[in-house]
A protein has these predicted regions:
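A short acidic, leucine-rich amphipathic alpha-helix
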Residues: 30-33
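Short, amphipathic alpha-helical interaction segments positioned at domain boundaries
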Residues: 69-73
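Short alpha-helical segments that sit at the start of domains
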Residues: 1-16, 39
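A cross-family signal for key residues in well-ordered alpha-helices
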Residues: 19
Length: 73
């Protein structure tokens, strides 16, 4: 399941992951728990969100970019 629609906007699961990241850095496990999504979906979704410029990876954790923050406000 994709996290980014063809129009560049996040899907429902993508939005859940972005909202889970809103509070700060999060590991895939923390994001999965907060978003209520399976870990395998979060891992693949984070790759998509990072490639789309909506999230950044720092070591083993992720954070929202300015672009990602704007999409969920």
């Amino acid at each position: 399941m994709a996290c980014i629609n063809p129009d560049g906007k996040p899907t429902e699961s993508g939005t859940k992951m972005l909202r889970a990241l809103k509070s700060g850095l999060g590991s895939p496990e923390e994001i999965a728990k907060e978003a209520g999504l399976p870990l395998f979906r979060v891992r693949s979704g984070l790759r998509e969100l990072t490639q789309a410029g909506l999230a950044n990876q720092k070591d083993e954790k992720y954070e929202l970019t300015e672009k990602g923050t704007e999409l969920i406000e």
